[in-house]
Each structure stands twice: as structure tokens, then as C-alpha cells.
From Swiss-Prot:
Specifically methylates the N7 position of guanine in position 518 of 16S rRNA. NCBIfam families: rsmG_gidB. It comes from the Bacteria. One of its GO terms (molecular function) is rRNA (guanine-N7-)-methyltransferase activity. HAMAP family: 16SrRNA_methyltr_G (MF_00074). This is Ribosomal RNA small subunit methyltransferase G. S-adenosyl-L-methionine binds at G82, L87, A132, E133, R150. Its EC number is 2.1.1.-. It comes from Corynebacterium jeikeium (strain K411). It is an enzyme of class 2 (transferase). It is found in: Cytoplasm.
Length: 222
């Protein structure tokens, strides 16, 4: 990606980064802009995002993911399950360089995209190809502080995939839509069976994005 001053960062399709991006990413805004360009070019070409998402890349995808950092403690190891195009893991890694972010993705073309972005932007993430439910993956990545995800699966199934990857006392934190309260009630037995405690729902990014992000946190208690 070409280097340029933050003040002139723009793309004909993506546009200028919003003011909130400067607040969230600080002196790493350049990396966020380079990632936005990856999404708008290679991400579209490889079918990781639809073309109609380009004008909404900042608000709906990058900032929506990065604000998850508001509810993650400093220095945590984070496993991003089904990372896909790198959401929420890559924006989180850019906004929070104190975190150790591991991007977990089973599909080869998505894994290759993640590896390319991680290498070219020198993000320092670990990119792993595999499925969260695979015992070998649990052995390799288990004991994390936090497991993140975005639009991966229904909450009950997501809990079964996520909690084995975190230590007791850790938690899964999933970005979910407005129906998350109904999911939490519907899947309560499945969550408990997976070793999860009482779930909490928080809104993050209220001062930064037009539509704040719903985060469901489920602690691993056994």
C-alpha cells in the first residue's frame, strides 16, 4: 500500500476515514486505512465481502469490530473464531496492539487473505487454519483469555465452539444483532451445558458509530 499523510488518506470508493477512526486507531490509522483498501479490493475480488459493502466498510465493518476493544482487558490473548475477512480480529489488533490476536479460519482462500494482510501490514497476529471444534485446534489455541466472533453461528453453537478455547475465568465475546437477548434466553441450557455462566449484553461504540455494537459476553465457569 502506498504511504501518504493521514490528512490525505482516501479512496474513491471508501472515502475519508471518519473522525471516529482517528480516535479509535490513533497513530495506527494508516494501518486501518491500508486494511480498508484490502477489504475494498482483494476482499471483494475473493468474495469475502459483497461490492455493496464498500461504502460501508468503515462504519459497518472496521469500526464496528474495533470498538470491541472497549470490553477487553489489557494484554489479553484473543482467539478470533471464523475470522473470515479478519472481522473483528484485524481491526481489534490494529486498535489494540497490546493484545495477542490469533485469527482462526477453516477455509483456505480466507486463510490466505488473512495471512497476506497480516504479513503486508506487519500486524504480528498468528493466523491459524482450522475449525474451533477440532481437538487439535483446542489443544493448540486453548487457554485464551477471550474468544471473539462476528456473525458466525447461533449463540448456543457458538458457545460450544468458543468456550473450550478459553481458560476457566476467561470469556467469549461475540458481536451480535439486536435479537441477542432472545438468543440468550433460547440457548440458556446449551450455554450452561458448555460450561458457560450468566451472559451479559453490552453496547459498545456508542460515541463512535451510528449503530452501536451489541456484545454478548459469556464467561467460562468450568
Amino acid at each position: 500500500m502506498a504511504k501518504q499523510d493521514d490528512a490525505s488518506i482516501q479512496s474513491p470508493d471508501i472515502g475519508e476515514p471518519p473522525a471516529a477512526a482517528r480516535e479509535v486507531f490513533g497513530d495506527r490509522l494508516r494501518l486501518a486505512c491500508d486494511y480498508a483498501e484490502f477489504l475494498a479490493t482483494a476482499g471483494i475480488e475473493r468474495g469475502l465481502l459483497g461490492p455493496r459493502e464498500v461504502p460501508r466498510i468503515w462504519e459497518r465493518h472496521i469500526l464496528n469490530s474495533a470498538v470491541l476493544g472497549e470490553v477487553i482487558d489489557e494484554g489479553c490473548r484473543v482467539v478470533d473464531i471464523g475470522s473470515g475477512a479478519g472481522l473483528p480480529g484485524i481491526p481489534l489488533a490494529i486498535a489494540r496492539p497490546d493484545l495477542k490476536v490469533q485469527l482462526l479460519e477453516p477455509l483456505l482462500r480466507r486463510y490466505n487473505f488473512l495471512a497476506e494482510v497480516n504479513s503486508q501490514l506487519n500486524l504480528g497476529c498468528e493466523v491459524v487454519r482450522g475449525r474451533a471444534e477440532d481437538p487439535a485446534v483446542v489443544e493448540a489455541l486453548g487457554g485464551a483469555d477471550v474468544a471473539t466472533s462476528r456473525a458466525v453461528a447461533p449463540l448456543g453453537k457458538l458457545t460450544r465452539w468458543s468456550l473450550p478455547l478459553v481458560k476457566v475465568g476467561g470469556a467469549m465475546k461475540a458481536l451480535k444483532g439486536g435479537s441477542v437477548a432472545e438468543e440468550l434466553e433460547r440457548d440458556a441450557k446449551e450455554i450452561a451445558k458448555a460450561g458457560g455462566g450468566d451472559g451479559t449484553i453490552e453496547l459498545v461504540g456508542e460515541s463512535k458509530v451510528a449503530e452501536p455494537t451489541h456484545v454478548i459476553t459469556i464467561p467460562r465457569i468450568r
